[in-house]
Regions:
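Mg2+-dependent prenyl diphosphate-binding active-site environment of isoprenoid biosynthetic enzymes
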Residues: 1-221, 225-238
Length: 242
């Protein structure tokens, strides 16, 4: 988003670092035995397998804290920013990091549920998966001085892409293979998780993912045109096999 709106790469680095710290910590914790109990992540042994459970837990804690340290120490030093903009960025970032955790809690509570609806699943994944994507797009928009309609378009796009990513993840957990995914297939079924595939079947889930990606594209093109980096990322996500 920053590139699309003419913010130099170096001036986006601190924000990217903060987002990646939150993302990485969420994956380290998500893999723990108390949660998804996964032994592979991106084709490599997970943190609690390489080290131990306590070390993985603390590593995640440090990454979360580091994200906010970057906000206080790094972000105000970059050219486009001042304390007012840094405060606006934090007001976007912090609640969405919290929503990500809330979504994970709801996801864990939904395991083995026999009566979860599509609306319930979407509510979970707007927080668990979509919130951090929403933060990334909105923060790029804020840094670049995006207009209110442009920020609304970025938020709308993020909400659709976040859901689409999760639907696609559910599909790949059934149709993919461990070598491509870099993590074990069938882990959702093993944990009896509530998924879009479980709810509607593979074919309907594929159609739903396609419609969500289309909505995300539409939100961006309406305000930001049809030649931009966000559309390229959306296309990559749609084609991904891992």
């Amino acid at each position: 988003v920053g590139n699309m709106l003419d913010i130099p790469d170096n001036d986006q680095r601190a924000i990217s670092m903060a987002i990646e710290c939150i993302h990485a910590y969420s994956l380290v914790h998500d893999d723990l035995p108390a949660m998804d109990d996964d032994e592979l992540r991106r084709g490599q042994p997970t943190a609690h397998i390489v080290f131990d459970e306590a070390t993985a837990l603390l590593a995640g804690d440090v990454l979360q804290t580091l994200a906010f340290e970057i906000f206080s120490a790094e972000i105000p030093t970059f050219a486009p920013f001042n304390e007012v903009i840094a405060s606006k960025l934090l007001a976007v970032f912090a609640p969405r990091a919290r929503r990500m955790v809330a979504g994970q809690m709801l996801d864990l509570n939904a395991e083995a549920s026999t009566d979860i609806s599509q609306t319930d699943l979407e509510s979970i994944h707007r927080d668990k998966t979509g919130a951090l994507i929403e933060a990334a797009l909105l923060m790029g928009g804020i840094c670049a001085g995006a207009t209110a309609p442009q920020r609304m378009a970025l938020q709308d796009c993020a909400q659709h892409i976040g859901l689409a990513f999760q639907v696609q993840d559910d599909i790949l957990d059934v149709t993919g293979n461990t070598d491509d995914l870099g993590k074990p297939v069938g882990s959702d079924e093993k944990l009896d998780k509530s998924t879009y595939v479980k709810l509607m079947g593979v074919d309907a889930a594929k159609d739903y993912a396609q419609s969500l990606f289309a909505e995300g594209r539409g939100a961006i093109t309406r305000e930001l045109g049809d030649d931009n980096a966000v559309l390229a990322v959306i296309e990559w996500l749609w084609q991904r096999q891992k």
